[in-house]
Amino acid sequence: MKRNLCLALIVLAATLGGCAANKPGNDPSLIGSWKGVRSENGKCQFLSWKNNFKPDGTFNITFFRDAQQTQPIQTEHGIWKAANGKNELRTAGVPLPDTYTYTLIDADTVHYVSVAKDPSGDCQEDYEFTEHRIRG
């Protein structure tokens, strides 16, 4: 009986491991550090930011009051999922995710359009922005 149970557990573990291995990952072209700004003349309050999309599906983002990024406002972290031109950010402590469509302009430039956001977010307007990869 013990042997059958052990064998069943091994088969189950192998099956689940195989499913995890086939799980689609995040778009690898977004992994890394990026910076962006919200237009000063746009629909929402001006912000600039630096974010880091990690391969393990976590992110952190620091918001700044100024374009030079010397006056931090706050840092947030959470999990991200991106595939097929859709990026979803689930910030820790925020009930609903922010969702964007994205288009890669080149390896170091990505354009986003906001399509869904948590009602507690600082801007409830639809807006778009471009981020640039931070190298070095």
Residue ranges of each PLM-predicted region?
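Bacterial N-terminal signal peptides
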Residues: 8-15
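Bacterial N-terminal signal peptides that target proteins for export
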Residues: 1-6
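Predominantly extracellular/secreted and cell-surface proteins with exposed
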Residues: 78-82
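Lipid interaction determinants
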Residues: 19-75, 86-136
